[in-house]
């Protein structure tokens, strides 16, 4: 009887005196679960990327076996992985993208993640120029054009991220690949519209309508200079606009008030998104 009372007393003390300990234990357990999930996610991503790299090696062998000095396209399914791992689709496109040199663009995709690589084919030697990995249902595509008006073709990977609140057409722009040795680096642009004859880029930033900016950049060789930003004027609830050189640094001395958007912005892709606001969108500003 005495032992039962003592045991009950210990249990009561434990319940009354350890809410902080219980909270800490709960937090530790929660952190452990999160960490385990992150480890599984990281491990799965690494496995997926390694499998895509294996498929890329197979694609290079296909090119070595089948490319005979002329434009060539080929699409096939790589071997299926274990369990429920999906087929990997391989898309190969070999062309003279730049002058007289053949390049190969290869996509390896498991329908969730995509690995993209660009190779220069020089006397049967495959030189890797770029390699980009796109996770989580991001579907990239490529385009070739003169972005900065220097009469030299540029290469771009375009994609729309699978997460985020607002319009976000992303360009990875690789300037003048034919003029550069080794791996290429890119300039990242969001919602751009290119005006190569003017050596300009006009576009829309990232954010909600009414709070997102228009921008204008000028090419200086392969560098970009910021010329101006335009934002809806909060004071007039978007009926007029403010123009300045600094996005968040407008001052009364430097800002220019506009009663309407300049005509030069009317051809910006997605302009309707920039203008898709009402007076209510400024009520909390």
Predicted regions and their residues:
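Calcium-coordinating acidic loop motifs
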Residues: 146-148, 282
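Repeated scaffold domains used in trafficking and secretory/extracellular systems
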Residues: 137-143, 187-194, 237-239
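Acidic, small-residue rich beta-repeat scaffolds with periodic aromatic anchors
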Residues: 16-98, 198-285
């Amino acid at each position: 009887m005495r032992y039962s009372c003592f045991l009950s007393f210990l249990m009561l003390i434990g319940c009354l005196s350890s809410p902080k300990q219980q909270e800490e234990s709960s937090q530790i357990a929660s952190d452990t679960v999160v960490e385990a999930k992150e480890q599984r996610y990281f491990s799965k991503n690494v496995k997926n990327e390694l499998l895509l790299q294996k498929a890329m090696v197979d694609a290079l062998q296909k090119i070595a076996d089948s490319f005979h000095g002329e434009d060539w396209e080929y699409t096939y399914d790589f071997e299926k992985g274990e369990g429920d791992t999906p087929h990997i689709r391989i898309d190969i496109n070999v062309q003279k993208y730049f002058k007289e040199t053949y390049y190969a663009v290869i996509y390896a995709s498991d329908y969730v993640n995509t690995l993209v690589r660009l190779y220069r084919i020089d006397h049967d030697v495959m030189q890797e120029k770029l390699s980009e990995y796109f996770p989580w249902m991001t579907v990239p595509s490529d385009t070739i054009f003169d972005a900065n008006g220097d009469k030299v073709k540029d290469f771009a990977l375009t994609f729309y991220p699978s997460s985020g609140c607002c319009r976000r057409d992303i360009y990875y722009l690789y300037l003048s690949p034919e003029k550069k040795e080794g791996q290429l680096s890119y300039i990242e642009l969001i919602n751009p519209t290119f005006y190569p004859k003017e050596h300009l880029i006009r576009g829309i930033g990232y954010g909600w309508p009414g709070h997102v900016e228009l921008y204008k950049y000028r090419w200086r060789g392969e560098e970009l200079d910021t010329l101006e930003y335009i934002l809806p004027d909060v004071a007039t609830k978007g009926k007029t606009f403010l123009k300045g050189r600094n996005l968040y640094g407008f001052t009364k001395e430097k800002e220019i008030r506009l009663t309407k958007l300049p005509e030069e912005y009317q051809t910006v892709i997605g302009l309707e998104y920039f203008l898709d606001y009402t007076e209510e969108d400024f009520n909390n500003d």
